[in-house]
């Protein structure tokens, strides 16, 4: 949850990294070099205030809802994993992963093709491809097909999981008949 482009960096004085981006600080604009004190030494340019505020809201929401949210994610993700195991030609790559991320492929079909079908014919959004991890895909043997990645959130329902599984079952069946 939150806007892309924002995160946190936690460290202690012994592991304090050296700044790698330099530029105006906004707090000490008269200096030609980055300030030496934290956090200013790590804050080059204009801060992404909307993303920072959104991240703060996401953290607050998670602190209030995290336990129930995690239980819902686990329930829906496990339903998806167990359902995918029953569909011929579906290869799941995240069986032992306890998160809400489920990655799979269908036979030797392109993950992009599967993603497009899910989007265009079923209105289901997933990610496809190599997910910025080409070496992982080489290790897994999926560098040619990529993987379909489902990201389950606490707002997803079992009904949505079954709709998704029904769509994958139809797609896999159609791909087998080609």
Model regions and ranges:
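Pyridoxal 5′-phosphate
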Residues: 1-178
């Amino acid at each position: 949850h939150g806007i892309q482009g924002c995160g946190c960096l936690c460290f202690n004085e012994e592991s304090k990294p050296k700044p790698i981006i330099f530029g105006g600080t906004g707090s000490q604009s008269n200096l030609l070099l980055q300030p030496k004190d934290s956090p200013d030494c790590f804050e080059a340019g204009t801060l992404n205030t909307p993303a920072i505020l959104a991240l703060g809201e996401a953290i607050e929401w998670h602190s209030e809802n995290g336990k129930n949210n995690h239980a819902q994610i686990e329930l829906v993700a496990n339903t998806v994993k167990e359902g995918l195991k029953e569909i011929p030609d579906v290869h799941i790559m995240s069986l032992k992963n306890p998160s809400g991320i489920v990655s799979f492929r269908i036979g030797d079909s392109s993950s992009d093709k599967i993603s497009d079908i899910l989007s265009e014919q079923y209105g289901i959004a997933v990610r496809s491809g190599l997910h910025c991890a080409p070496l992982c895909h080489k290790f897994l043997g999926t560098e040619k097909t990529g993987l379909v990645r489902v990201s389950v959130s606490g707002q997803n329902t079992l009904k949505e999981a079954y709709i998704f599984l029904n769509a994958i079952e139809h797609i896999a069946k159609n791909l087998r008949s080609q």
